[in-house]
Curated annotation (Swiss-Prot):
This is Uncharacterized protein YhhL. PANTHER family: INNER MEMBRANE PROTEIN (PTHR38775:SF1), INNER MEMBRANE PROTEIN-RELATED (PTHR38775). It comes from the Bacteria. InterPro entries: DUF1145.
Length: 89
């Protein structure tokens, strides 16, 4: 339940950050939001790269949809993965 709320909030954050690209906010806020967008892209990309590097080479590979979800939702999707693998073990 809380993970889904976090995902919804993350979608709102992405929407706010991308809205600034489409319709730039006033000058000081514009710069801050652009920096936040760059930081978010870098951090979510790093999370995706780290998760991919920890998966076994001979095990099942991540689908494109899973990669997109991890990139969009970041830590919320990683928490969902953690719950899913705890149930399997």
């Amino acid at each position: 339940m809380l993970i889904n709320i976090g995902r919804l909030l993350m979608l709102c954050v992405w929407g706010f950050l991308i809205l600034n690209l489409v319709h730039p906010f006033p000058r000081p806020l514009n710069i801050f939001v652009n920096v936040a967008l760059i930081f978010t892209v870098l951090m979510h990309g790093m999370q995706l790269a780290l998760l991919k590097s920890t998966l076994p080479k001979d095990g099942p590979q991540m689908t494109t949809a899973e990669k997109v979800r991890i990139f969009l939702f970041g830590v919320f999707e990683l928490l969902a993965w953690q719950k899913k693998f705890k149930v399997k073990k």
